[in-house]
Amino acid sequence: AWKGFESSQPILNDEIDSNYPKISSDARWYNPVMHPATASRSAKDCPNANEFLWYLMYGEPHWDPSIWSIMKHLYDGGMWLKKLSVIAKDQHKTLQELKAAAPGETDYTKNYPSAPKIYEAYVKDNTNIKLGKPTNSSDYIFLPTFGYYLAGTGKLTFLGRYGYYWSSTPRPDGGLNAYNLYIRRDKVHVGYGDRTNAHCLWPE
């Protein structure tokens, strides 16, 4: 969202700057690809909607209050989740099987004409959160609470409280939303959000 305007990118919580993308002709504007197509630009390598549910349900989240740094500033708090390869091994599945269907065998990357609002069943929380860095941290990825940039203002919000991450799957029933995942101290959440907001890309 701030490519080419890094010098004005907000780096403190609740900081605002107007140099965010506002119109679709801006190269930084979100990709308007419609479901069931998948992301083809910056989010193309992010997990799909099915994989996010595997992270949510079998990632054994650990909240870690440790300090991390970004853009020359220090912040604290983030969530450890098991790597997808570890989840696949634990569940006796292949990575391709995790990509092809969520737990319960629904494939949220496909259209279901008889259930156009299937995304309503997608929204879920995991509140079974352990405290502290996992001892076998090499089996996990760390998601910092970087917050997100709010459309309409360019405001950096929820820094140090939430971390928002995009999937590679647009949400059906219109083209504005995509499936996402967020973390905070007491939960991991999967759902969907407005693509005009700027979320983080998946670190794995």
What is the predicted function of each stretch?
Residues 1-41:
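GGW-centered surface loops in extracellular recognition modules
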Residues 62-204:
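C-terminal, surface-exposed recognition/capping segments
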